[in-house]
Regions:
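Short, glycine/charge-rich beta-strand/loop segments that flank catalytic centers
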Residues: 104-112, 139-150
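Short, polar/flexible loop-turn hinges at active-site or ligand-entry regions and domain interfaces
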Residues: 76-83, 131-139, 356
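M16 family metallopeptidases and their MPP-like homologs
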Residues: 38, 43-59, 65-69, 84-130, ...
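Generic structural signal for individual residues within well-ordered alpha-helical segments
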Residues: 121, 142, 189, 197, ...
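Histidine-acidic residue clusters that define the catalytic metal-binding segment
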Residues: 5-26, 169-209, 241-247, 284, ...
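Short, conserved secondary-structure transition motifs
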Residues: 149-155, 245-260, 366-375
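His/Glu-rich zincin catalytic helix
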Residues: 1-88, 112-115, 125-127, 198-305, ...
């Protein structure tokens, strides 16, 4: 995907919006479907993704996990592609060498296929069919509920996932980032099929979706196929249900302890950071890399090299709404939780007070350049990265954001550490492993 092509064409039923770094944006005139196309005529494969602008942030108590459960149900068949007529997605595409899957997260859901390019039309037809004609049936809910519940239980048995879930639930009192994408167990088990159908009808429409194609395809032919298949759907009648809940200001440190059977002790420290499109996010990402990216990072040298911890990571999440920067440390045997917490906070304070060196800054930027190169390493990598920017609210960040990362200065890093890594704005979590009986 190193070479970039931008063959702008005119196709009846679509409106060209703009081109940016080889990505063509169109709109479907009849229903507002957003279309993003990146062509490489020499590629033997094509990637196709439908990103719905709905995720767990659009759920509420009683139907948490609805987006994820619907993801499972939408593979159970649709009007023209189902097991009854022996035209399931698996029989039609996987048998032809396609990679077929879907993912759900806080701000989006996507369905995708990566396949030999001659089968792109089939993927377009199939995804258009289940956009508005998916089978949402009680018998499928019952069977898939047990699959999803097993996923939930695996997460509960993973110390890191269990602690992470607790930290997000404590950091957010009001905003739906409070609950994880998989939902609460009782909602998974008991949500009525009528509620899932309502959720589907609330959000799964062309004017709440983005279609992306990457790789080997003809732009004119692809647009014509999208017009033919997705143009069958109208835009939604009425407004979408807005997610208008804002998290109130935090007034003091919050703490949680998860104590359960296990063999791993953990410490997690989270701080609120702005939404993905905020101008401070590039500096916060560089800060996270300086803290815990690789064996020369500050926290690795402080915690792992000293044998106090066996692993450490820091991640700045980039979501549609204000999110979290979190550091996790996996403790070595007999290391006190309090010791790790103090050392992490000391590292934060040191950067806020004294800043970072040019060596640290340059090392972080080298890591960023490697990551940026990986974003175009094949159709799925490209689609996945583009999808996250769509979810954040601005797909053009896929092109513009890397430049902002390499422009971050040492003063920027010190400033955001001082502004956001404040104890009174933190959520601290400890996982204490109890003896297994």
């Amino acid at each position: 995907m190193a070479r970039r092509f931008a063959t702008r064409v005119t196709v009846s039923g679509t409106t060209f919006v703009r081109e940016l770094d080889g990505i063509l944006e169109y709109r479907l005139n009849t229903n507002g479907l957003q279309i993003l196309l990146t062509q490489d005529p020499n590629a033997p494969v094509a990637g196709f993704m439908v990103t719905y602008h709905v995720g767990s942030r659009n759920e509420a108590i009683g139907y948490t996990g609805a987006t994820h459960l619907l993801e499972h149900l939408m593979f159970k068949g649709s009007k023209n592609f189902n097991k009854e007529n022996k035209k399931t997605i698996w029989e039609i595409l996987e048998t032809k060498g396609a990679l077929v899957n879907a993912t759900t997260w806080n701000d989006r859901t996507n369905y995708f296929e990566v396949m030999p390019k001659e089968h792109l039309g089939t993927a377009i037809t199939l995804e258009a069919d289940r956009m508005r004609h998916a089978h949402i049936r009680e018998e499928d809910r019952q069977s898939e509920m047990t699959v999803v519940r097993n996923e939930f239980e695996r997460g509960e048995n993973n110390p890191m996932e269990a602690l992470d879930k607790q930290i997000w639930a404590l950091a957010y009192e009001a905003h739906p980032y409070h609950h994880s994408t998989i939902g609460w167990r009782s909602d998974i088990e008991k949500v009525p099929i009528a509620r899932l159908k309502q959720f589907y009808d609330d959000f799964y429409w062309p004017d709440n979706a983005t279609v992306s194609i990457v790789g080997g395809f003809d732009v004119k032919e692809a647009l014509a196929m999208i017009v033919k298949e997705f143009g069958k759907h109208s835009k939604k009648k009425g407004d979408y249900l807005a997610m208008y809940t804002e998290e109130p200001n935090q007034e003091g440190e919050r703490r949680a302890t998860v104590a359960r059977a296990g063999n791993t002790d953990l410490v997690g420290i989270a701080h609120k950071v702005p939404a993905a499109v905020h101008s401070d996010i590039p500096a916060l990402i560089i800060l996270a890399l300086i803290l815990a990216d690789g064996k020369t990072s500050r926290l690795y040298r402080t915690l792992v090299d000293s044998a106090l911890a066996i692993d450490v990571s820091t991640n700045c999440y980039q979501f549609h709404d204000p999110s979290l920067l979190i550091t996790y440390a996996t403790l070595a045997s007999r290391t006190p939780h309090q010791k790790i917490e103090e050392l992490v906070k000391d590292a934060y304070r040191a950067i806020a007070l004294k800043g970072v060196s040019s060596t640290e800054l340059n090392r972080a930027k080298r890591s960023i350049r490697t990551y940026i190169a990986s974003l175009r390493d094949g159709p799925y990598a490209f689609l996945s990265a583009l999808n996250e920017q769509i979810a954040a609210g601005d797909w053009t960040r896929f092109v513009t954001f890397p430049k902002k990362l390499v422009q971050v200065s040492a003063k920027d890093v010190q400033r955001v550490a001082r502004q956001y890594l404040i104890d009174d704005q933190s959520t601290v979590g400890w996982f204490k492993a109890l003896p297994q009986i």
